[in-house]
Amino acid sequence: MFNIVTRFQYAANQALTSSIIIAGIVIVSSLLQLYSNNAWSLGTTSISNIKPQVSLKHSFNYGSVNRKPKENSRIQFDLETDLSPLFNWNTKQLFVYLTAEYPGKSDGSSNKITYWDKIITSKEDAVLSLKNQKSKYSVWDIEPSFRQRDAVVKLEWNLQPHIGPLIFGETDEIADFKFAEYVDKKKEQK
């Protein structure tokens, strides 16, 4: 330790090593607290009253090509859940999203779409009670029609901590519905 550069290097190495050790302790203790709170088995979720709706859209923004109409799907649903066990002192925010998974065109393939999402930033807002909630997004399939396919709905989440890796999970509760067929209301009125 005879010159200023050596002293600075020693102090910087000590600070960096200490910071990494403290960050590791924070990450491990945060994960242990989530495990002790049973955060991965949230048993208080209820997804119900799913009402699918299908409409035709002519816009490129809704999957239309060459102005040919494209079926777009939306849903209306009820959701009851308590996500507060996912919050601790290291939780920055929780990204919650409602997905539907349905069979694809080829055997063994499946498609997954997101109808609704929300960012929750505090434990007080982590209890959701939604009635007749409309989906946030209108979705379309690569195929021309949803053709009365069955879909399984799940509530999934992404926990974003202040320090540490992103943590993905889903609730145990699932619900299912059959995509509605498009009915041309103008033709029905004639």
Swiss-Prot record:
Lumenal side: 33-190
Function: Essential component of the signal peptidase complex (SPC) which catalyzes the cleavage of N-terminal signal sequences from nascent proteins as they are translocated into the lumen of the endoplasmic reticulum. Essential for the SPC catalytic activity, possibly by stabilizing and positioning the active center of the complex close to the lumenal surface. Essential for viability.
Protein's recorded name: Signal peptidase complex subunit 3
Family, similarity comment: Belongs to the SPCS3 family.
PANTHER family named in the record: MICROSOMAL SIGNAL PEPTIDASE 23 KD SUBUNIT SPC22/23, SIGNAL PEPTIDASE COMPLEX SUBUNIT 3
Membrane spanning residue stretches: 10-32
Alphabetical GO biological process terms: protein targeting to ER; signal peptide processing
